[in-house]
């Protein structure tokens, strides 16, 4: 049985600025290699915010989910994190596990 290699990324975030946070995490993760799982903070792309109405995305049209899928493929590692999702009119802090293949759980 081989070891599970996990990378934890706990960094300062830019309050409610998705684009800045996605760029920042891409820079932070640039040197990361040879890992199986990358765990990002809760609500990593906005920092923990109660402004869900303005920041929520749908799973079907999520910039954040597209970014996670791309990064999982680039890093050949699974990602776990959460972000604000609007589903059937309600808001959720939804945890997602993204495989390098692009499958989302």
Short names for language-model regions:
Residues 1, 5, 51-52:
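General secondary-structure edge motif
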Residues 3-13, 17, 94, 105:
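Active-site-proximal beta-strand elements of phosphoester/diester hydrolases
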Residues 19-24:
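Glycine-rich anion/phosphate-binding loops
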Residues 27-100:
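Cys-nucleophile CN-hydrolase/nitrilase-fold catalytic domain and related Cys-dependent amidase chemistry
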């Amino acid at each position: 049985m081989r070891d599970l290699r996990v990378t934890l990324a706990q960094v300062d975030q830019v309050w409610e600025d998705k684009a800045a946070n996605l760029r920042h995490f891409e820079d932070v993760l640039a040197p990361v290699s040879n890992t199986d799982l990358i765990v990002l903070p809760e609500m990593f792309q906005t920092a923990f915010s109660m402004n869900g109405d303005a920041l929520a995305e749908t799973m079907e049209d999520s910039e954040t989910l597209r970014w996670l899928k791309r990064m999982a493929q680039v890093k050949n590692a699974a990602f776990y994190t959460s972000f604000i999702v609007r589903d059937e009119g309600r808001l959720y802090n939804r945890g997602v596990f993204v495989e390098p293949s692009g499958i989302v759980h």
